[in-house]
Amino acid sequence: MNETLLLFHAPSRPELLKIQRALLPLHIRLRCISQKDYLQPLGFLAGMKKFSPTTEVYDGEELSAPLFLFCFFQNNRLDQALAALRRCGAGPFPYKAILTPTNCEWNVLTLSLIHISEPTRRS
């Protein structure tokens, strides 16, 4: 599968353009996910054929901040993408996750509930 970066709660247009320009030389596909699709399985949003869409449409609150989900990245490419995002000047982006065999069945609300509350549990 092709490297894909899913972006939930996309920032304003100027910041989004900075992100796109940073990823372009790396040939990384950026996909902005609409709020109405927040109940879809992450694997489906990433393009995994074994996942089907849900018929539910999300109409709740937006995430508190942008969240990046890195899909199908090898370690060195993940490092390159993270470095490009740091240098682009659109951040900081506190919420980043990697698609795994476990979380590909979740939706972004489940991911964000676990991911965003993690720093709180460490304190």
Model-derived regions: residue spans:
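Short, flexible, solvent-exposed loop/turn segments with mixed acidic/basic and small polar residues
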Residues: 1, 55-61, 86-88
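Gly/Ser/Thr-rich loops at beta-strand to alpha-helix junctions
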Residues: 9-15, 38, 73-77, 102-106
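Short, compact, well-ordered microdomains
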Residues: 80-87, 96-109
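Single conserved hydrophobic/aromatic residue that forms the stacking wall/gate
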Residues: 114-123
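Mid-chain, well-packed structural core segment of small domains
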Residues: 59-85
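N-terminal, charge-rich interaction modules
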Residues: 1-50
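A generic structural motif
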Residues: 29-41, 92-105
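Short, structured active-site "lid" loops
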Residues: 45-65
